[in-house]
C-alpha cells in the first residue's frame, strides 16, 4: 500500500515526529511505501509534500489562533479566513493523494490538538468527501490543555477534533486518553502505546562524536550534566528541576534542556530563565543542536541525537505534572 502521513510538522525530535518515524519504519519493513504531508519537514523531498500553511507557526495560522483562544465569540472575518485556508489545504491534500496514488492516510495529531484549526477542518472535509481510509493517531487531546479551555470554535472542535467518520479509525497512546475519547466523542479506538526499539543498538557513548557534546556545550570535565529531555512547556514542570539543582548547592550542576518551546509560546521559557537566574542555576538550552541523526549542520556544528545526550548525562530529570 501507499500510505501518507499527515501532520503540521515532521521535523526534529518532537514526540510526534519521533513516534511517527517508528510507525513508518515498521510499515516500510512490511513492504508498504510511505509518504509525508506537513507544513515543516525534514523528510526526503522525493516522497514529501511540504505546504507551509500546514505548519502551526505560519503567519496566517497565528492570526487565526490569536482570535479563537481565550475568548468565546469570533467575528465573521475569522470564520471566513478559517474556511478559506481550510479550502486551500484541502486542495493540497487532494494533490498529495493524487500525486503519490495513496491508499490510506495516517493523521498524526492534526485531528487531536487544534494548533492548526484550518488543517483539521480540511482533513475532516477531505475524508468525508472522498471516503479514503484513514487512521487518526492521537497523542494529546485539546481537552488535556488548559489554554484551549476557553475558545470561540466549539463547533469546529466538535466536528473536527477529532471527527466521527466511518472511514476513520482512531488510535490512542494510553488508556486514559482512550476512555476520554469514548466518553466525549462516543467513538471506539485502538490502544497502541509509544515504545522504544530495543532491538536496535545504541550509538557508542564513548566515541568521538558523543565525547564532543560536553565541551561544545561549554561544560568542564568535572561539570555535572543534568538533562531535562523535554520541550519547554508548563506541563513538564521544569521549575522543579531548577529548584532541585538549586537545593544541591553545587555550581558544577548544569541543567541542559534538549528541546525548544514548540507550539505554546515563550512565556514559560522566560519564566524559567528568570527563575534559574534567581536560583543561581546555569541553564543550557540545546534544541538547536539536537537532531534525529548525527550530522554537521550548515554552520559547521555537530548535531547530536537525543541518545547522545542521554548517554552523556549524569542525571535525568522528568518532573512532569502530567503526560500523554
Locate the predicted segments by residue.
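A conserved catalytic-core segment of Leloir-type glycosyltransferases
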Residues: 26-29, 33-104, 274-278, 283-293
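A short, active-site helix/loop in glycosyltransferases that binds the activated sugar's phosphate group
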Residues: 151-204, 208, 271
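Conserved donor-binding/catalytic core segment of Leloir-type glycosyltransferases
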Residues: 211, 215, 220-236, 242-245, ...
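Short donor-sugar binding/catalytic loops of nucleotide-sugar-dependent glycosyltransferases
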Residues: 9-11, 111, 229-233, 260-263
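Aromatic "clamp/platform" in nucleotide-sugar-dependent glycosyltransferases that forms part
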Residues: 321
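Nucleotide-activated donor-binding/catalytic signature segment of Leloir-type glycosyltransferases, i.e.
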Residues: 220, 266-308
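Short N-terminal targeting/anchoring amphipathic segment
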Residues: 77-84, 93-119, 133-137, 318
Amino acid at each position: 500500500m501507499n500510505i501518507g502521513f499527515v501532520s503540521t510538522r515532521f521535523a526534529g525530535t518532537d514526540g510526534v515526529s519521533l513516534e511517527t518515524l517508528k510507525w513508518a519504519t515498521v510499515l516500510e519493513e512490511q513492504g508498504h511505501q510511505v509518504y509525508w504531508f506537513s507544513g515543516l519537514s525534514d523528510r526526503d523531498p522525493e516522497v514529501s509534500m511540504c505546504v507551509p500553511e500546514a505548519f502551526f507557526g505560519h503567519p496566517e495560522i497565528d492570526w487565526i489562533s490569536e482570535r479563537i483562544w481565550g475568548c468565546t465569540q469570533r467575528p465573521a472575518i475569522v470564520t471566513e479566513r478559517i474556511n478559506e485556508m481550510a479550502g486551500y489545504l484541502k486542495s493540497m491534500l487532494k494533490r498529495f493523494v493524487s500525486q503519490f496514488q495513496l491508499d490510506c492516510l495516517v493523521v498524526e495529531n492534526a485531528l487531536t490538538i487544534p494548533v492548526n484549526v484550518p488543517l483539521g477542518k480540511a482533513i475532516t472535509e477531505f475524508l468525508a468527501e472522498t471516503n479514503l481510509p484513514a487512521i487518526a493517531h492521537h497523542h494529546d487531546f485539546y481537552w488535556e490543555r488548559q489554554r484551549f479551555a476557553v475558545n470561540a470554535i466549539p463547533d469546529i472542535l466538535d466536528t473536527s477534533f477529532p471527527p466521527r467518520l466511518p472511514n476513520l479509525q482512531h488510535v490512542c497512546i494510553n488508556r486514559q486518553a482512550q476512555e476520554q475519547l469514548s466518553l466525549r466523542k462516543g467513538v471506539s479506538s485502538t490502544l497502541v502505546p509509544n515504545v522504544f526499539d530495543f532491538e536496535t543498538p545504541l550509538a557508542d557513548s564513548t566515541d568521538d562524536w558523543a565525547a564532543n557534546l560536553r565541551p561544545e556545550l561549554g561544560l568542564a570535565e568535572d561539570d555535572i550534566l543534568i538533562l531535562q529531555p523535554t520541550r519547554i512547556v508548563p506541563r513538564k514542570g521544569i521549575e522543579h528541576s531548577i529548584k532541585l539543582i538549586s537545593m544541591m548547592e553545587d555550581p558544577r550542576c548544569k541543567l541542559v534542556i534538549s528541546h525548544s518551546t514548540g507550539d505554546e509560546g515563550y512565556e514559560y521559557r522566560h519564566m524559567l530563565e528568570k527563575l534559574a537566574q534567581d536560583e543561581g542555576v546555569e541553564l543550557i538550552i540545546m534544541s538547536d543542536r539536537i537532531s534525529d541523526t548525527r550530522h554537521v549542520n550548515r554552520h559547521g556544528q555537530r548535531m547530536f541525537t537525543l541518545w547522545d545526550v542521554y548517554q552523556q548525562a549524569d542525571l535525568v530529570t522528568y518532573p512532569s505534572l502530567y503526560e500523554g
